[in-house]
From Swiss-Prot:
Name by which UniProt lists this protein: Sp110 nuclear body protein
Entry's Gene Ontology cellular component terms: nucleus
Region Disordered: start-end pairs: 131-310, 337-385
InterPro entries in the cross-refs: HSR_dom, SAND-like_dom_sf, SAND_dom, Sp110/Sp140/Sp140L-like
Length: 478
C-alpha cells in the first residue's frame, strides 16, 4: 500500500470534486452503493434512510447520490475511494470503470511532476479486494539496471513474502541479424516497473473492459506478460523482427551474475495457462491489425519488388475496385437526387395548397329584407330614476309646463312657505306653483307636483320627503 502525502491527497480531493457529477450519473441503482457507504461508516444510518426515502418519493437518484458525495467531500478520506471503486461496485456499475481510470491518471500525472513517488510498502494478500492504493495510484519505478541486464523481464512479487523477490526472469535471446526491440510501456530507458502477483490474479478474473489500460504513460498495472515459448516463436516468425509490439521471450532459470537477488521459478498453475491462451489471442489480434496498417514486408526487409506481371495484375484489381466504388457512389448520388426531387415536389404542392387556402374568399352581400310597412317597434326608453338622487336637499319638480326646484328644508316649515324656485329665479309657494302649471283647482297638490315621474305623495310615503302642514294650500291661501 502507498503512503499518501498531503499534496497527493489534495490532488485526489480536487479530482473527486471534478468527477462528482459523473459518479452521480454512473450510479444507476441504490443497491449496493448506499449499503457499502453505510457499512463502512462513511454515512450515518439517518442519511442512509433519508436517501432511500428520497428515492421512494421519486427524487432523481443522481441528485440523491450527488448530495451524498457532497457530504463525503467535507470529510474526504482516501480510503473512501477504495469503497467507491471496489470490485462489487465496478461489477454493478460498469460506468465507474472510466472514472476509476481517471483517478489512476491523476496519480500518474502526480508521479511525473513529483519525484520521488510514494513508497511501496507491501501488497494485499486478499485476492477478493477489487481496488487498492497499489492499483488506484501509480507505482514507483525501480532503479536503472546495468546494460547487461537490459533484457531482463519484470519482477513479480510473491504474496506470501515480505520483500520483493524475483520469481521469473524472461531473458531476450540475442539475434545475430537484428537486436530485440523492447516492449513499449513496460521497459523504457533501461528501467523496469515492479508489479505484484495479485495484479495477475485480478486480471485473470476480471473482464478486459474493467481492466485499466494506459498505452502511453508509465504504467504500474500490467495485464499479463507470461507467454509460452511456442506462441512467442510463432509471433516472431509471422511478424517482422523490428516491430515495436513483439518481443522474443525465453525463460531462463539461471541467476544473473550481477543481480543481488536470487531468482525463483514461479509454479505453472491452470490460471496462468488460461492467461497465456487469452494473452496469445489478444496479441494475435493486435498483430493482425498492425499488419494491415503497416507496408508490405518486402519493403521493410529490403526484398526486391515483385515482377511486372504481378504489378499489372495488382493494377487491374485496383482499377476494378475503384470502378466498383465509383458505381456504388453514382447509385447513391442518383438515389439522393431522386429523394431531393420528390421532397421538392411535395413541398411545392403543399405550398400551393396553403396559398389557395390562405386566399380571402369573396364575401356575399347580405340580402335586403323587404320592409314591411305598419310594423313599428317601440323601444321603451330607459328609466332615469336611478340617475336622480331623492336624498338630496333639493328636488327638480314639475307641474304641467311649470318647472322649478323644491327645497326640502323650507317645505318642512309648511306648504305656505315659499319653498319652490322657478327657472326665472322667483320664489313661489305651492299654490302659486300650481297656478303656474295650470292645476290650481287640484285637490291634492302632492299628487299634482311630480319629481322625475314620481309624485310628492309617493316620495313622502317612501321617506324621501317630509311635510309638516297637513292643511291644504287653498285654505292657507284663504
Amino acid at each position: 500500500m502507498f503512503t499518501l502525502t498531503k499534496a497527493l491527497e489534495k490532488a485526489l480531493l480536487q479530482h473527486f470534486i471534478y468527477t462528482k457529477l459523473d459518479i452521480a450519473y454512473a450510479i444507476n441503482k441504490p443497491f449496493p452503493f448506499f449499503e457499502a457507504l453505510r457499512d463502512n461508516s462513511f454515512i450515518t444510518e439517518r442519511m442512509y434512510k433519508e436517501s432511500l426515502e428520497a428515492c421512494q418519493n421519486l427524487v432523481p437518484l443522481s441528485k440523491v447520490v450527488h448530495n451524498i458525495l457532497t457530504s463525503l467531500e467535507q470529510t474526504f478520506d482516501p480510503s473512501m475511494l477504495l469503497i467507491l471503486f471496489s470490485k462489487v461496485n465496478l461489477r454493478e456499475y460498469p460506468s465507474l470503470g472510466a472514472i476509476c481510470r481517471s483517478f489512476r491518471n491523476v496519480g500518474n500525472a502526480y508521479e511525473g511532476r513529483n519525484r520521488p513517488a510514494p513508497t511501496l510498502l507491501g501488497a494485499s494478500t486478499n485476492p477478493a479486494e477489487g481496488c487498492s492504493f497499489q492499483t488506484l495510484l501509480p507505482q514507483p519505478r525501480s532503479q536503472a539496471l546495468p546494460p547487461s541486464h537490459l533484457s531482463s523481464g519484470l519482477r513479480i512479487r510473491d504474496p506470501g513474502t515480505t520483500s520483493l523477490q524475483i520469481t521469473e526472469i524472461l531473458d531476450e535471446q540475442p539475434s545475430p541479424s537484428h537486436p530485440a526491440a523492447p516492449l513499449p510501456g513496460y521497459i523504457r530507458e533501461g528501467k523496469t516497473t515492479p508489479v505484484s502477483s495479485r495484479d495477475h490474479q485480478r486480471k485473470d478474473k476480471e473482464d478486459s473492459q474493467e481492466m485499466p489500460h494506459h498505452p502511453s504513460g508509465p504504467e504500474a498495472v500490467v495485464k499479463d506478460i507470461l507467454t509460452s515459448k511456442t506462441n512467442n516463436r510463432d509471433d516472431s516468425g509471422a511478424q517482422p523482427p523490428g516491430s515495436p509490439g513483439t518481443m522474443h521471450v525465453v525463460q531462463d532459470n539461471s541467476p544473473a551474475p550481477n543481480d543481488p537477488e536470487v531468482p525463483q521459478e514461479a509454479p505453472c498453475t491452470p490460471a496462468n495457462k488460461k492467461a497465456r491462451k487469452r494473452k496469445s489471442c489478444i496479441w494475435s489480434n493486435s498483430k493482425r491489425r498492425r499488419q494491415k496498417k503497416k507496408p508490405p514486408q518486402h519493403k521493410m526487409m529490403g526484398v526486391a519488388s515483385p515482377g511486372p506481371g504481378v504489378q499489372e495484375k495488382l493494377k487491374v484489381v485496383g482499377q476494378r475496385t475503384l470502378n466498383q466504388d465509383d458505381s456504388t457512389r453514382n447509385v447513391k448520388v442518383v438515389t439522393r437526387t431522386l429523394r431531393e426531387r420528390t421532397r421538392c415536389a411535395q413541398t411545392s404542392s403543399s405550398q400551393e395548397i396553403s396559398k389557395e387556402a390562405s386566399k380571402p374568399r369573396a364575401r356575399k352581400r347580405p340580402q335586403k329584407r323587404p320592409h314591411t310597412a305598419g310594423r313599428t317597434i317601440h323601444v321603451p326608453e330607459k328609466s332615469k330614476d336611478d340617475a336622480v338622487d331623492f336624498l338630496s336637499p333639493t328636488l327638480s319638480v314639475t307641474c304641467g309646463e311649470a318647472r322649478g326646484t323644491l327645497f326640502k328644508e323650507k317645505l318642512k316649515q309648511g306648504s305656505s312657505e315659499k319653498c319652490i324656485q322657478n327657472e326665472a329665479g322667483a320664489w313661489l309657494t305651492v299654490k302659486e306653483f300650481l297656478k303656474k302649471g295650470g292645476k290650481a283647482t287640484s285637490k291634492d297638490w302632492k299628487k299634482a307636483i311630480r319629481c322625475n315621474k314620481k309624485t310628492l305623495r309617493s316620495l313622502e310615503q317612501d321617506g324621501f320627503l317630509f311635510c309638516t302642514s297637513k292643511s291644504k294650500p287653498q285654505k292657507e291661501c284663504d
